[in-house]
């Protein structure tokens, strides 16, 4: 892994996060000896015995947060419960959530098993101003969880991002392909390519380029990503204007 976010890039002014999505990225990160304030590990890796062993070892020395799917349905409660069991077996109690349903499910599971889930909201959850952040914090508390920080929405400009705080830590995504559509419809299934395994295909658009579409078969939905990767690099004036607590870089399946 090269170009990992680290304190030397940001002069120690900001905490740093990285998002590992594949087994290869996880192995490379561990072997590199790099250290960040937070490491996100994609939920799909928790299905693999070897990955769970590596994740548990990583969690002994660094803060690890498990990401969760973009969509879960009532019929997937058992699958979701098994996923949380695998995550908890790695001594992880912090989760990057993508929807309100996951917060409710985590709260129920936490009450049954005696732990308080710590929540990091992803950029897709509604946190567009301080009032919505307060409302979300109340919802999370009622569910028996604890709001740790929020990821700033992509739709906000830099001045608006600076106004979203109210005592809650914020995270700014500096590098990644942005999810532009999340759907229960499956492109691979439409093309007759469904093999019930998580996978990626590419859609070519003459005007806007190539889009990566990730099939999340374990929870039966797909995620289309932007054709171009956002990369703000180290723009000190921009970061000072946003003033986030964390800066995040996502490694992608490209």
Residue ranges of predicted features:
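Active-site pocket-lining/capping segments in soluble small-molecule metabolic enzymes
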Residues: 1-254
